[in-house]
């Protein structure tokens, strides 16, 4: 009798245990055009590429999160730097990523194979962080990172829905975004001990704020899964809306974090981005996204600093008008 009562006490205590809360920061494209790399070279005294100053203005938002996720769109490859249309980015970008406070990065994009499998390999080697979306082997492709955050175990899964038509070295080199594949990988992560998954998708139509029909369809299907808690996305190079789909947050497009895109070549909004700050609660292995705050960002020229957009500025108003406001969603103060 005493043992039974003790067991019940343990069970009730676990049920009554307060939930833990944590914040995940997710940001937009690192799109390292030639002029951005040239600024990093200047910041490095002309001897090395130092990208750290570009991100110092937003460091508190990245380092201040419990988990920070970045999106490396272009391959990190030693040797001559190349910009658009076939990128080769200095590997020292990875040093800036780590110094700014990002904890893991997605690497699946339409530029993942700009330098072939070699570029995939050198990117992963340079990052020295958990990554998802590209792989050096079939085994690596099957093992998405599971990240520990305040006792919760979060799988990070990344995929691209778009490519530039490059030859694919191996079936496992880049993770392609199909609903069945994504759901399979999310379930596999659950079997490996993950409580839930955050899915990063490189998707949508370039320079369009509108959510495409294919984005809507994929978001609806994925958010029906109990194995997925939230979706974040990039590729459009402009901000896209943040919505609740099946009661889960979907950040359809975070815009560019850093690039050389301006109104001179592209929409003025290509200088805009956002850092999504998703607040989760975890209790007894159940993880749920409760609310989203976001930091509108802007790429300042000519020094390419990524700065929080001034409240009420043209950039801030553009981003807020697209990203949206709701009881669970608002720009951060």
Indicate where each model-derived feature is located.
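Bacterial N-terminal signal peptides that target proteins for export
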Residues: 1-4
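Acidic, metal/ion-coordinating pockets
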Residues: 8-333
């Amino acid at each position: 009798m005493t043992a039974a009562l003790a067991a019940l006490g343990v069970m009730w205590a676990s049920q009554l245990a307060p939930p833990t809360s944590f914040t995940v920061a997710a940001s937009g494209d690192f799109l390292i055009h030639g002029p951005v790399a040239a600024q990093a070279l200047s910041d490095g005294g002309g001897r090395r590429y130092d990208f750290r100053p570009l991100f110092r203005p937003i460091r508190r938002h990245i380092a201040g999160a419990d988990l920070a996720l970045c999106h490396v769109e272009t391959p990190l490859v030693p040797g001559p730097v190349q910009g658009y249309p076939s990128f080769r980015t200095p590997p020292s970008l990875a040093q800036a990523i780590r110094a700014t406070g990002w904890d893991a990065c997605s690497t699946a994009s339409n530029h993942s194979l700009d330098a072939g499998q070699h570029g995939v390999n050198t990117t992963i080697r340079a990052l020295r962080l958990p990554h998802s979306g590209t792989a050096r082997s079939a085994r690596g492709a099957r093992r998405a990172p599971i990240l520990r955050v305040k006792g919760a175990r979060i799988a990070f899964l990344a995929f691209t829905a778009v490519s530039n038509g490059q030859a694919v070295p191996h079936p496992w080199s880049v993770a392609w975004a199909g609903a069945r594949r994504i759901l399979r990988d999310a379930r596999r992560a659950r079997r490996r001990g993950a409580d839930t998954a955050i899915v990063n998708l490189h998707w949508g139509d370039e320079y369009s704020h509108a959510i495409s029909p294919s984005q809507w369809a994929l978001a609806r299907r994925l958010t029906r899964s109990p194995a997925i808690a939230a979706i974040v996305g990039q590729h459009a190079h402009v901000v896209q809306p943040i919505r609740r789909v099946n009661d889960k947050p979907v950040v359809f497009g975070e815009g560019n974090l850093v690039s050389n895109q301006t109104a001179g070549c592209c929409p003025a909004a290509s200088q805009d981005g956002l850092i999504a700050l998703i607040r989760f609660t975890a209790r007894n292995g159940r993880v749920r996204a409760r609310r989203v705050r976001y930091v509108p960002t802007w790429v300042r020229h000519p020094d390419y600093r990524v700065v929080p957009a001034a409240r009420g500025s043209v950039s801030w108003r553009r981003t807020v008008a697209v990203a949206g406001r709701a009881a669970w969603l608002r720009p951060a103060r």
